[in-house]
Every structure is written in C-alpha cells, then in structure tokens.
Amino acid sequence: MCDEEVAALVVDNGSGMCKAGFAGDDAPRAVFPSIVGRPRHQGVMVGMGQKDSYVGDEAQSKRGILTLKYPIEHGIVTNWDDMEKIWHHTFYNELRVAPEEHPVLLTEAPLNPKANREKMTQIMFETFNTPAMYVAIQAVLSLYASGRTTGIVLDSGDGVSHTVPIYEGYALPHAILRLDLAGRDLTDYLMKILTERGYSFTTTAEREIVRDIKEKLCYVALDFEQEMATAASSSSLEKSYELPDGQVITIGNERFRCPEALFQPSFLGMEANGIHETTYNSIMKCDVDIRKDLYANTVLSGGTTMYPGIADRMQKEITALAPSTMKIKIIAPPERKYSVWIGGSILASLSTFQQMWISKQEYDESGPSIVHRKCF
C-alpha cells in the first residue's frame, strides 16, 4: 500500500466533546463526550466482565454507577492517563483503525503549555507508534475551514473561549485572549435560573437534560432590555419542552438570559469582559496595520457560538466599540460546531502539507522537543 492511500486521522480533543475522523472527509465520523468513568462500587456479579474504566458515550450511559472525570479542563489536558484512554478509545473503538498505520493530526488549545505539546507528541509516538503526527492550533484550523488565512477567530466550546488573531496563517500569541466562560458555565447558569422558576435540576444526569434545553431553545437577544420587556408583557417568547419522564416545562426569558452571560459575564458573578469586548481587546493588541483585516474577518467557531442571533449581536456590539468608519464582518459558518475538525481535515489532505508531518524517524533523532520546531 503506497503512502498516498493511507488516510491521515484527525482528532480534535475538546473539553466537552472529542471529534475524530479521516482527513478528506467533510465531517467527523465519531463525536463523543471527553469523559472517562470509573466504577464507584465493587461489582457483585461474578463473570460480568466489569471493566475498570469506560469512555465517552458508554461512560455517559452508565454514569449512575461511575465517577466521571473530564481529562481536558478549559481546553488544556490535565490528566494524561485518562487522555490516553480517550485516544485509545478513539482509534480502536470509534474509528477502528491501527494508529501505527496512519499519520495523526491532533489539535491543541491556543497558548497550550510547551510541556503539554511534548507530552502529546511523546504519547503518539511511544504509546501508539504512529508513523507521523502534527499538532495544530484549534482556532487556526477554524479559520482555514472558512477559507481564510487572516482574521480573528472567536472560538467558544464547552470549557473555554479564546479570541485568536491570525495573520497569513500564523496565530499572534501576544494578542490571544482567553475567557474561562463557555458552554458548561452556561448550562450551569440555565440550571440555576430554571430552579428559580421552580424546576429543580441538580444531578449530572439532569444537567444533560438542561444542556439539551439550552441547545434547542436558547438564543441571543439583539437588545437584551427590550427582549426582557417583551417577555414580561407577553407570552410570545415562551416555549415548552418535554422532559424524559413526560412532564412538560415552559421556559420564557431564560431562553435569552442564559446566553446573555457571554456578553455580560457579571450574570455568572464573573469579573470579566464579554466576548465582544474580549474580541475588540484582542484586535487592539495587534499591529495597527492589520486591524482592518481582522475587523472584516471575524470568524465564529465552536458549539457555544451556535445560538441563533449571536452573529447579529456581535456585529452590533463590535460596531459600537470600533472606529465609526470601520467595515466589520462577522462570519458564522453553519458548520462552525465542527469547523476545527473540518479545518484539520482540509489541512491534513493538502499536498503541500505532507512535508510538514513530524516523522517517527525525526522523533527518534530529536525527541519530543521536535514539536516546537515543526509545529508553530
């Protein structure tokens, strides 16, 4: 089998979900929760073949008897043993491939510590024996997926949000800003404000229900105060949702109060700037000559940018902050939930990229630090 036929594997490890598949595909084959669960109790049934750990959907469905851990916190891997289990599950159970036969493209959070990139590299070559690998910054891949090489990406997932200015394909590290406010915080906030309505959601299982309510019914208001007034005076904004047990709940202003926290983190008791100010501050940290290009190419990426109305609201807020003559364009691709993965799929299948891979041979000669020389 010649090299041309071996598809590279693309794995985008997010705080909440892991997206994996083959380079050249237009969507990931496998999308599963980034969780590892271990049994809380000793098994009583003899011969049940109890596993000592469960990953992804299986961990999710057995969560009643497991202790769940997320090895990726705020976009950064903090537990390598569990991370290894997630990668093992990705290759062998989800994609059903032998990692020693495929180059692997991994993604990393912006500002990922150097030691972390080295550790990822080491695990790929030493544990999984991959023939070649590469580590790419998530936001840069999202920008590629939108067909650009210059722009600013607001990437907001489950565990962390970043604003990443990119010029001619290179992220500008001095201007990257991180906001520890993302999907998980919004789910928690929605649990809290639904409790105020008299619906009690407390367990991890119930949190998943609230996440579903959030994904199906929430939206961003163009004018928050005006929307609050509308919600107070009529029931036109109310929607109902059927819980798994058949009970139907009604939600009104919670629909837009929940994602409003992205623009007003004070709702969550956080002293931080909203995503619009963070984006603006990120642009202002860049060279004055490239700001025009960033304002005109502001790309939204990640699951937490999927709320209806978010692009219009960003346009309005950034227009208010920017110089009055500035052309501002917010790009919100419909597939932005997976745009990091899609960008990776595009990158790994480019003919010009093939000399960029770190080969097993190069790794054996230089060790894990090779990653800083070849992936930047």
UniProtKB/Swiss-Prot annotation:
Modified residues (N-acetylaspartate): 3
Enzyme class: hydrolase
Gene3D superfamilies: 3.30.420.40, Actin, Chain A, domain 4 (3.90.640.10)
Posttranslational mods: Oxidation of Met-45 and Met-48 to form methionine sulfoxide promotes actin filament depolymerization. Methionine sulfoxide is produced stereospecifically, but it is not known whether the (S)-S-oxide or the (R)-S-oxide is produced.
Chief site of localization: cytoplasm
Prodomain residues: 1-2
Compartment(s) where it occurs, according to its Swiss-Prot or TrEMBL record: Cytoplasm, Cytoskeleton
Protein keywords: Acetylation, ATP-binding, Cytoplasm, Cytoskeleton, Hydrolase, Nucleotide-binding, Oxidation
UniProt note on tissues of expression: Brain of newly enclosed adults.
Enzyme Commission number, as recorded: 3.6.4.-
Modified residues (Methionine sulfoxide): 45, 48
Record-level Gene Ontology MF annotations: ATP binding; hydrolase activity
GO cellular component terms, semicolon-separated: cytoplasm; cytoskeleton
PROSITE patterns: ACTINS_1 (PS00406), ACTINS_2 (PS00432), ACTINS_ACT_LIKE (PS01132)
Catalysed reactions, as listed in the record: ATP + H2O = ADP + phosphate + H(+)
Record-stated family: Belongs to the actin family.
The protein's role, per its UniProt record: Actins are highly conserved proteins that are involved in various types of cell motility and are ubiquitously expressed in all eukaryotic cells. Multiple isoforms are involved in various cellular functions such as cytoskeleton structure, cell mobility, chromosome movement and muscle contraction.
Protein name: Actin, cytoplasmic A3a
Organism in which the protein naturally occurs: Helicoverpa armigera
Gene name tied to this protein: actA3a
